């Protein structure tokens, strides 16, 4: 399953880029898509896709998803923004991803986040202003179609994980609390 989302409010450019590839995505008979558009974008995306009943069985549109953990756990691949919370969730589950940093994020931190993932081999990255490009399409379909690409990303993501994260975080919290 391909999960597409842009954070809790959605991401219009991601929505538009994925909608533009509707026919090519649906040409893959085993591909199911869960597309979380953002509440304000749901009607526009629904209208733009104009899914038939058969297509709607494979392309599930939601304005918002409050059970994101379960949705992420079901994903084989993800297209999303590169915010810290999204990446923490994606990382914990080692899900292959195509990251699209939000270009107006403070200090461009989402690009910094995504770049670290790309350098480790755990994700692809595409700048927001290049979402309509052939490169976006090539990366998306490599993610969907090539099991070895996904397997490599999973292995890279797992190599980044630490089993000591909770203990390290607790040490920081205790250190800050006792310094007061």
Predicted regions and their residues:
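A short, well-ordered alpha-helix in the C-terminal region of glycosyltransferases
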Residues: 149-163
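Two-component system phosphotransfer/interaction surface
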Residues: 131-145, 170, 174
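A ubiquitous structural signal for well-ordered alpha-helices
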Residues: 21, 48, 139, 153-156, ...
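A donor-sugar binding/catalytic signature common to diverse glycosyltransferases
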Residues: 68-110
